[in-house]
Amino acid sequence: MADSKQAPLDAEAAAKAAFASVQDRPFPDDIFTAPELRWAVIGCGVIANQMAQSLALAGRKLAGVANRTLSKAQAFAEQYGIEKVYETVEDLYADPDIDAVYITTPHNTHITYLRAALAAGKHVLCEKAITLNSAELDEASAIADEHNVVLMDATTVLHMPLYQELRRRMDAGDFGRMNLAQLNFGSYKEYGDLTNRFYNRCLAGGAMLDIGVYALSVMRLFMASQPAEVVSLGNTCETGVDVAGGIVCRNAEQQLGVVSLTLHSKQPKRSVISFDKCYIEINEYPRADHATIVWTADGHREEVHAGTEAYALCYEMADLEKAVAGDDSKRELLGYASDVMELMTKLRADWGVVYPEEE
C-alpha cells in the first residue's frame, strides 16, 4: 500500500492557520445534515491528518485507518482516537462496520483502491486527482453503479458552499451571460530534487494532476457545457512530467476558459469569471469562502461570503453522506469531475505526458 501523498507546504501552513481561526467557534449545525456514516481512511499523510483534524472540530472521528506502514497507521490512530487499525486494506474492505472509505494515497494508486473498495460495497471519497485518466474514472464509475454505491471526487471546489451560492445566482440570471473564465495557479517547487512527487513520473507527478485540476474544475463549474475546443502549450521536464501550461477552451455557447499553470513560479491562485453584468474575483480559490463581485453598471463591489475555509474537508465528507441519503445534486458532482478528467487526459496527451501505468 502506498503512503499518502504530501500536500504543498504553503497549503499545509494555510490549513493550519484556517484551523486555528475556528478552534474556539461552535461547529456549524448545517454541514453534517445527513445520517452519519462510519468512515475509514487509506493513507495517513498530510491530507488525511487534515481530515481527522477537520472532523475533530465537528466532534466526529474516523472509525478506521489503513496504511502501507502499520506503525504509521497505529500512530495516526492513537493521535486521533481511531478505534480500528487494519493490517491490510483487504481487512478494511471486509469490515462490515465500515460504510465509507476516504482514499488519500498518490494519484497513480487510486484506481487500485477504488476497484477494490467499490466492489466491496463501500462508498468512496477519493482525493484529487481521482484517477490518472478518463478510462480509469469511467471504470470506477461503472463499478460504483454496479454495486449501488457512491463515488465522489474530493476536489475541494466541487464542495465549497461559495461555489454553490455563486452558481445558484448565476443560474437565476443575476450575473447575465458568462463570457470568460480566467484562472492562474503557480506553485514554486524546488527543481533540484527530481525524485520528489511533483516531478516524479512514477508517482504521477506534474502540474496538471496536482494543481490544474483545481483551475479546470472552477472553469467547468461556471461554463454552461463541456468545452469542445481545447488548444494549449505545455512544458515538460527531463522526467517526462508537465511543469507548466497555457490552456484556452471554448464550448458550444462560445464561452471561453483561459488557464495558466506552473510549478516553477509562484502565481496568485486567482480566478476572474466575467459576465455581462459583472465580474467575480475569487482569490485562493481551491478552498475559497469569499468572492468579490464588481458590477459593470456602476462599479460597486459586493462581497459574498459562504462557508468556511477550515471546514473544506468536512464539506466533502458531508456531500458524500448527503448523496448516500438520496441527494441527487451531490451525486451529480461526479459529472463535473468526469468532464475535468476528460480535459486533463486530452491535455496530457497533447503534451506527451504518459505515466508508466498508461504505457
Task: List each language-model region with its residue ranges.
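N-terminal Rossmann-like dinucleotide-binding module
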Residues: A2-Y80
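Predominantly a Rossmann-like dinucleotide-binding segment in NAD(P)-dependent oxidoreductases
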Residues: V157-V230, E238
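Beta-loop-alpha module in the N-terminal Rossmann-like domain of NAD(P)-dependent dehydrogenases
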Residues: M51, T69, Y80-A142
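NAD(P)-dinucleotide binding in Rossmann-like oxidoreductases
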Residues: N235-D242, N251-E321, D328-G335
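C-terminal helix-rich "cap/oligomerization" subdomain common to oxidoreductases
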Residues: M1-T33, A100-Y102, A252, D319-E359
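Rossmann-fold dehydrogenase core element
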Residues: E139-T156, R177-A181
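Hydrophobic residues in well-ordered beta-strands that form the structural core
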Residues: C126, L151-D153, I282
